[in-house]
Amino acid sequence: MTAAFTVRVKDETASKLDQLAEKLDRSRSYMAAEAIEAFVEQQEWQLAEIEAGLTEADRGEFASDEDVAKVVRKYVKSARQS
């Protein structure tokens, strides 16, 4: 089942969407639906991760000072080598 609704976007965004649709041989509607589906999936994932993190925090599950220091050292070392 599908639902239809109207979305307002800037003219520039509509133009870019039309260009992409043409290059990919798809309709504007298809491209918009794909973009919305991807956005919804990403937002659902992000919210689930935030909720899981908050649940862990409520249980007092935090990274130790040593765990944090290891991660910092890893990325500081990587940045210096670049």
Swiss-Prot record:
Kindly list the cysteine pairs connected by disulfide bridges: none
* Keywords linked to the UniProt accession: Plasmid
Any GO BP = regulation of DNA-templated transcription
Q: Which Pfam family, any one of them, does this sequence belong to?
A: RHH_1
The reply to whether Metal-binding figures as a keyword in the UniProt entry is: no
User: Which superkingdom is the protein from?
Assistant: Bacteria
InterPro entries per record: CopG (IPR002145), Non-func_TypeII_TA_Antitoxin (IPR052991), Ribbon_hlx_hlx (IPR010985)
Its name, as the record gives it, is: Uncharacterized protein y4kO
